Amino acid sequence: MAKKITGYVKLQVPAGAANPSPPIGPALGQRGLNIMEFCKAFNAKTAQIEKGTPIPVIITAYQDRSFTFEMKQPPVSFFLKKAAGLKIGKKPASGSKTPGKGAPAGKVTEAQIREIAEKKMPDLNCDSVDAAVAMIRGSARAMGLEITG
């Protein structure tokens, strides 16, 4: 018989930097999950990924207080900022203050967008790489990035 699922927890955790402080501790504590066990497992799985890369993770909580977790690719905005050479981090915001008007925040090439689309393909809700490229182009425009060649 399969374990009974009691819920899901969605978090975005920096690679190799999971610790019991907020937001991880309270989110897992509410479900009665072992926080340190998750932190150790997550940090071990993300050891080969560049430190500080934001990793979306979906934790499945079971009735017996055990859990499993699934990691996704970093957000598109992270890849776009990296490709454009912008500062990566939450504050200060490194996108354009007024996207579509005035000076662009940075530049990305079509080749970089295609590369990002191929990396993100498993996580995106689309069937073809061309559709993924269109989604990422839209994200780049919304961030105030100029798309070249």
From Swiss-Prot:
Q: In what way is this protein post-translationally modified?
A: One or more lysine residues are methylated.
What Pfam families does the database record attribute to this sequence?
A: Ribosomal_L11, Ribosomal_L11_N
Biological process (GO) annotations? translation
Can you name a GO cellular component term? cytosolic large ribosomal subunit
Q: List the disulfide bonds.
A: none
CDD domains, per this entry? Ribosomal_L11 (cd00349)
| Gene Ontology terms for molecular function | large ribosomal subunit rRNA binding; structural constituent of ribosome
> Partners and quaternary state?
Part of the ribosomal stalk of the 50S ribosomal subunit. Interacts with L10 and the large rRNA to form the base of the stalk. L10 forms an elongated spine to which L12 dimers bind in a sequential fashion forming a multimeric L10(L12)X complex.
Q: In its UniProt entry, what is this protein called?
A: Large ribosomal subunit protein uL11
Q: Which gene encodes it?
A: rplK
